Amino acid sequence: MNISKPQQRTLHALAQGGRIELERDDNGRIISADCLTRDGWALTDCTVAVFQSLKRKRLIASQDGGPYRITRLGLANLRAQLDNRVGAKAW
């Protein structure tokens, strides 16, 4: 499955324990999608378009009205990436 770079970044943040929280208007339409890492930082690559494409591909899901998290299908389609918490130049 083809996944764009912003989608990959969002999925990696979700795989490390992050979540996507939505803001809706009075009609129930999505205004913004905020991807928060497990440390509480916001990911700027996560837009409404990225959220909708991940949801359409069933790579993320919400359970019992909670925030959106990565699914097993999302984990299976995620490409391996080194943990980006420590840069290679730091060693």
UniProtKB/Swiss-Prot annotation:
Signal sequence residues: none
A Pfam match: YjhX_toxin
Family: Belongs to the UPF0386 family.
UniProt protein name: UPF0386 protein CCNA_00226
